From Swiss-Prot:
ATP binds at I369, G370, T371, G372, G373, F374, G375, E376, V377, K391. It comes from Arabidopsis thaliana (Mouse-ear cress). This is Wall-associated receptor kinase-like 20. Its EC number is 2.7.11.-. It is a single-pass type I membrane protein.
């Protein structure tokens, strides 16, 4: 023993010396790091106007998602339906551009020049939106516009504008004012179909100041848009990234299948304003950017603590097994307390390991009915004849164990006809088990896409709508009625079970999260958490900023709606490379005005005119759910209400016939 002590006494200072030498060498190397390279090429000026990155006027500069046009020394912004507007100013710091509204079609009419295109409509899939700094004047309106938040009263600003600047509109029946300040960003200013035939817009009009008196000039008209900060440049190989950003790698973009982007090397991070790999200021890659003294001090502490732990482990090796058993007992006790504390007391109970082992025939593979990344599901028959489904974490999978325990916390607090019912829990085996009601008719995924072991009768359009409505109701209950609110976080067609009457039951709450409103900023319902879910269904905003909200579930449900309309999988590698992701595929078909080609042929074969109308309506609802900006997506309650409205259209048609 004395020899061992002498050995450690010599070993510790030797290791410290070697470690410090290596640390000093490493820090010296880091001190000689090259400065970051310039970013992607900025487009040349267009006449007198500077074109900042990421705006792009050509295929070799800027970011192609931010296309604008340079024609005759002027910049133009292209909207949908072939409309185009002059850009009067650009602010690269605030990422905003101001457009010139079209004005009236003639000097004697009160009709907008773009009335044939029904006003300004932006492509919601592009990174531009209308800001909240605009005051919109709606001219030549019908009585249908007399509702809040539109102001059509005699004191409305638009009447003052008509007197000064738009005399052709003085004989029009109504004019109204709409302030976008404080509202959500939008993509549309509608005229014609919305009850008005003309519009004008002003940026930053102060409502607390009087408008110009008669005879005085109003400020110039303008409509302000904002662009979202750009992602890293698109690439094909590392060579592209070296040319654009220096030492960066070309890696797959997790939010866009088939697309690759440059990823800055460690110690640097993407600066979307200056379009460079700049000095790292936050995030996990910044941890190496420490001063030499701090690094060396940390090294000393780490080595010392590590050696101390090593000596302690040698001395306590023989007591390890006893400690492990004690920990297991404590975990079992914690599970029991958690179940009894959260249970509604109606039907949830604790099952014994002996009961479950017998019911599953010792977890025979013959009873295995499902498996996933974290767990397995077995069919089981209890002693009273009740058929159940039993979920078990995989052996040595701590994430699976955590998810099953999380599922207990969630399901013990909810009760809804469209949510799978938890019968109880088993806590005295090595792995925790959940016992559910057995749902016999497979999953929505299997009914839409088929399964290897069973043939399913195709779902009718009316049945698909009922399943969509029931699922939306269940999710709306989690978001709104449950206290605290619950976000599912893994909504997909394979997690929607169908009973013997083809009614929907939402299942698999392993990734779900309870929302503690007391811990979220300003009492808003969002959670910061590592992105988890299923590829093809994952909300891109959640993936980018780790902010989980109820709208993350809405996005995932939008993908499910697309599956119902098309009978195509969310991710399918048998499709062309650019079409692997269903959302991207549908967006492409919409741009090409070929959306009807995507509808499930079995639906089209039997659909009448009303069916096709409601199929289109559900497709539009799916598109709203999939809006890239979460604030523009409907709530799950609104989704359920819209599906109910669509179902009522079909019901009225049946009644009339």
């Amino acid at each position: 023993m004395e020899k061992k002590r002498s050995y450690y006494a010599l070993l510790i200072p030797t290791l410290l010396t070697v470690w410090l030498a290596c640390a000093g060498h490493s820090c010296a190397r880091h001190a000689k790091a090259k400065p970051p390279m310039a970013g992607p090429p900025r487009c040349p000026n267009c006449g007198p106007m500077v074109v900042p990155y990421p705006l792009s006027t050509g295929p070799t500069c800027g970011d192609q998602a931010y296309r604008i046009n340079c024609v005759g020394g002027k910049l133009y912004f292209g909207a949908l339906h072939g409309s185009s507007y002059v850009i009067t100013s650009i602010n690269s710091v605030t990422q905003r551009i101001v457009l010139r509204p079209p004005g009236l079609a003639s000097s004697v009419s009160c009709i907008s020049a773009d009335v044939s295109k029904q006003g300004l409509e932006l492509d919601p899939h592009l990174p531009f939106s209308i800001t909240s700094s605009n005051t919109i004047l709606l001219l030549n309106c019908s009585q249908a516009m007399l509702q809040a938040p539109i102001d059509c009263s005699p004191t409305s600003l638009c009447y003052s504008y008509i007197k000064n600047n738009a005399s052709p509109c003085s004989k029009a029946p109504l004019c109204c004012t709409f302030r976008t300040d404080g509202s959500q960003t939008a993509y549309t200013i509608r005229i014609n179909g919305g009850g008005c035939l003309a519009y004008q817009s002003f940026v930053g009009l102060n409502p607390n100041k009087e408008v110009p008196p008669p005879g005085k000039k109003w400020p110039d008209t303008g409509l302000e848009l904002q662009w979202a900060l750009p992602k890293e440049p698109v690439c094909k190989t590392d060579v592209d990234c070296n040319l654009l950003l220096g030492k960066s790698k070309c890696l797959p973009d997790p939010t866009s299948l088939g697309l690759k982007r440059c990823s800055c090397k460690k110690g640097l991070e993407w600066d979307p304003v200056n379009a460079i790999c700049g000095k790292c200021r936050h995030g996990k890659h910044c941890k190496k950017k420490k001063k030499t003294v701090v690094f060396a001090g940390a090294a000393v502490a780490v080595v010392g603590v590590t050696l101390a732990i090593a000596v302690a482990v040698i001395g306590t090796k023989h007591s390890h097994q006893k400690v492990k058993k004690d920990i297991h007992k404590n975990i079992v006790k914690e599970r029991e307390e958690m179940l009894s504390a959260n249970s509604t007391g109606k039907s949830s109970r604790i099952f014994t390991g002996r009961e479950i082992t017998k019911a599953t025939n010792n977890f025979s593979k013959d009873n295995l009915i499902g498996t996933g990344g974290f767990g397995e599901v077995f069919k089981a028959v209890l002693e009273d004849g009740t058929i159940t489904a039993i979920k078990r974490a995989k052996l040595n999978n701590t994430k699976g164990t955590d998810q099953i325990l999380n599922e207990v916390r969630i399901l013990c607090q909810v009760n809804h006809r469209s949510l799978v019912r938890l019968l109880g829990c088993c806590v005295d085996l090595e792995l925790p088990l959940l016992i559910y009601e057995f749902i016999p008719n497979g999953t929505l995924f299997e009914h839409l896409h088929g399964s290897s072991d069973r043939t399913w009768k195709p779902l009718t359009w009316r049945r698909r709508l009922q399943i969509a409505y029931q699922t939306a109701e269940g999710l709306a209950y989690l978001h709104s009625a449950a206290q605290p609110p619950i976000y599912h976080r893994d909504v997909k067609s394979s997690n929607i079970l169908l009973d013997e009457k083809l009614n929907a039951k939402v299942s698999d709450f392993g990734l779900s999260r309870l929302v503690d409103l007391t811990e979220t900023a300003n009492n808003e319902s969002h959670i910061f958490t590592g992105a988890q879910g299923t590829l093809g269904y994952l909300d891109p905003e959640y993936y980018r900023n780790f902010q989980l909200t109820d709208k993350s579930d809405v996005y995932s449900f939008g993908v499910v709606l697309l599956e119902m309309v098309t009978s195509k999988k969310a991710i399918d590698f048998t499709r062309e490379e650019e079409d692997v992701n269903l959302v991207m595929y549908i967006n492409k078909m919409m741009d090409q005005e070929r959306l009807t080609e995507c509808i499930d042929p079995l639906l089209k074969k039997t659909a009448n005119k009303i069916d096709m109308q409601t199929i289109q309506q559900l497709g539009n609802l799916a598109s709203a759910c999939l809006n890239e900006r979460r604030q523009n997506r409907p709530s799950m309650k609104e989704v359920a209400d819209e599906i109910e409205y669509i179902i009522n259209i079909l019901s009225q048609e049946v009644t009339e016939t």
